[in-house]
Amino acid sequence: MLHDIGKGYSAHHEAIGSKIAVKVAKRLGLSESVQNCIGFLILNHFLLPLTSERRDIHDPATIKSVAGMVKDARRLKLLFIVSICDSMAVSKTRFNSWRKMLLTELFDRTLSYLKNTEEYFKSDMYYIENATETAKNLKGKRGYNFLKGIKDLNGFITGFVNQFYSPGKYLTRESSENILLHLKLFSKITPGHRFNFVAKPHIGEDYYEIIICGEDKKTMFSDITGTLSYFDFNIMSADINTRKDGRFIDTFFVNHIYKKVDGDIDWHKLRNTFFNVFNGNISLEDMLKNKRKSESLYKKSGPRVSNSVEIYNNISGEFTVIEIQALDRKGLLYDIGRIFNVFDINIFASKITTQGNKAFDTFYVKNDQGGKIRNPLYIRKIKQAVINEI
């Protein structure tokens, strides 16, 4: 009831609202510990929703940061309840199954961290052993014939995982089932068949998990996001995995703008378009330009959006984090990806959030040397180039 009491006083109403709520609690005769708890909950009632939507919740630094703010499991549970109630009250359509899933996963991960910090950071071998057990169960089953002749499954999976530039990151993000699915997709890559993809429907949550693998190239992110945008997919999140053997496997979490997950989507046409775009047979830029032109005839104007680009090196221990706020439009990620290509920026994860006509895009990136982007002049040039494009 008190969480939005500060609205109307300032843009960041949670800070002043927290102070007002503490005064109210004091007048009601509540104990000092309850007063402090109420103040904390109101001050931080955006923490879990914004973190789950705009930060990489598989990055240990994210979980450590949230845990450091909430301090204990009881406060985390109370904050989770406030977050759920507030999100549901704002809008039933805004608090969809995807956002609920992200919020719940952030809560679960942070709770596990608070309960047993040492156990939370499991070794790579723990995940590989789980994947090995899954491989044993799948061996000989339809679609997994490539496992038949492999005697040392543990060594085989370890070798596969170690080809990623960030094997630890890959293992903590992917389930054992997905790791085996990736191996299956890679087993079908040949010189004449340079990419493979599969779309996994999540009907209850109303989104697709589109997994794409193949021979890596500089424009891969912009090629994929541009093609998905052309086919009217809304990209909500992406995990980007590049490998030392020149291959990639990327996962895009998407929903369709016009169709439900159980709707009729022409996957064959999407596959053919991917093939032609990857091989340079068609111009994705021209395709998007024509589609934007036709859609602009029917698009209604909305509120103005202030474009902004912020670049941080203190959010993640491993990555530079780039936050972009812009007017949402078809092909926005494609345009951002092209700018990143110019500056040799490699994307490892992205979180995409939209509120009305406003897009909040967060990218976890490295430079072409595999490190953070730290040069102040280079950072200014990146910011200006992105602002000019969006």
Language model regions located:
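Divalent metal-dependent catalytic cores for phosphoryl transfer on phosphate-bearing substrates
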Residues: 1-120
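Regulatory modules associated with amino-acid/nitrogen control
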Residues: 65-390
